[in-house]
Amino acid sequence: MFFVERFILKKLLSWKNSPYRKPLILKGVRQVGKTWILKEFGRRYYENTAYFNFDENEEYKQFFETTKDVDRILQNLMLASGQKIVPEKTLIIFDEVQDCPKVINSMKYFCENAPQYHVACAGSLLGIALAKPSSFPVGKVNFMQIDPMTFNEFLLANGDENLAQYLEQVDSLEPIPDAFFNPLYEKLKMYYVTGGMPESVLMWTEARDISAMQEALSGIIGAYERDFAKHPHLSEFPKISMIWKSIPSQLAKENKKFIYKVVKEGARAREYEDALQWLVDARLVHKIYRSSAPGLPIAAYDDLSAFKIYLVDVGLLRRLAQLAPTAFGEGNRLFTEFKGALSENFVLQTLITQFEVMPRYWSQNNPPYEVDFLIQRENDIFPVEVKSETNTSSKSMKKFKELFPDKVKLRIRFSLDNLKLDDDVLNIPLFMADQADQLIGLALEKMEH
């Protein structure tokens, strides 16, 4: 894994320094960089790191099965591995813990009886393990989520510190000068091609090797597809696989609502619900419910029968949809191809990292209107639209405002247009999606004055 500045390091440092620190469980999909980030964190901020991988050394599991005594567990681990562990000075990493309920459960004893040890656990498919609350250490751990690299992290990895820095320091709603605007669009197209999975980014930023990058993405998709077989009921395996493969087709529709019969002719919700939930728990997909109105709490207005499904990463979506990377050189094709789904997926990814509450969407039939996303920011709900062309006016956003005039302070549009606040519509260039929260704050301030 190559060196790259990942913003989660700041969060990890806050965890280390917190007086309320508990053992950490780092969640994230396979190959998103969990192990690398923990080792890098240990290297930077601790005297040493003690690393234990329960996939490679299954015999370590035994130490957790025979005792609840933390000192004894650590003594055994040190003797078996030859690594030293010093309270406060060592970062202890337990990796691949998803199949080790006893290890996960031992975090309770680390928390209660041995807070002087800094422990971090990681594992892929942890969402699945944690969905089964058999004997989980409730309230005894801190959770953190690591997502694919953001566009800003991609810029840093690509050697474009100047562009990343420019985006970080935007503090007004003035239009972005062409000297930044044009290169940022070109870089964003490249990000749509690579996505944010570190191995894929590495093949592009270090080697500029498109075919190696394609192979890296295929390898990651292959690893996920092998994971589907880990569902406890083998009969679910083909269903998970069919749902996964149907996602590009689901997003290529004008109306992106998830429809089971796109998965398989005649498929019914009840036959496929568990398989879909497995993908959601694994966080390989994001499930966005339809909201009937922009009320608070937003979850109270969920229509559980209508939802859209997006992929964990825009590059994986492009690869799964078999969209060739050559589209990068063809004008706006990456933005407009299959109904702008790559842009929607990209915007959703950044909204999830910036806002605590999972976004929703809004729609109504006859005549059909749809607002791509609703986001909750503090006690406000904002409609969000993603447009993959320039100069777009939107009937749905107008309709939404007509229906809920008191609820809509600001409407947000992500598009290929420049940054501007036009009455109550904030247009954010797609390449500034990572700055959405900050830009919304600036817009609200400006409107108040």
PLM feature segments, named:
Residues 2, 16-24, 31, 40-44, ...:
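A cross-kingdom feature that marks ATP-driven nucleic-acid transaction machinery
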Residues 45-60:
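Conserved catalytic segments around the Walker B and adjacent sensor/switch elements
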Residues 56-87:
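Short glycine-rich substrate-engagement loop in P-loop NTPases that contacts/grips substrate
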Residues 156-349, 353, 359-366:
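Interdomain hinge/linker elements that couple catalytic modules in large macromolecular machines
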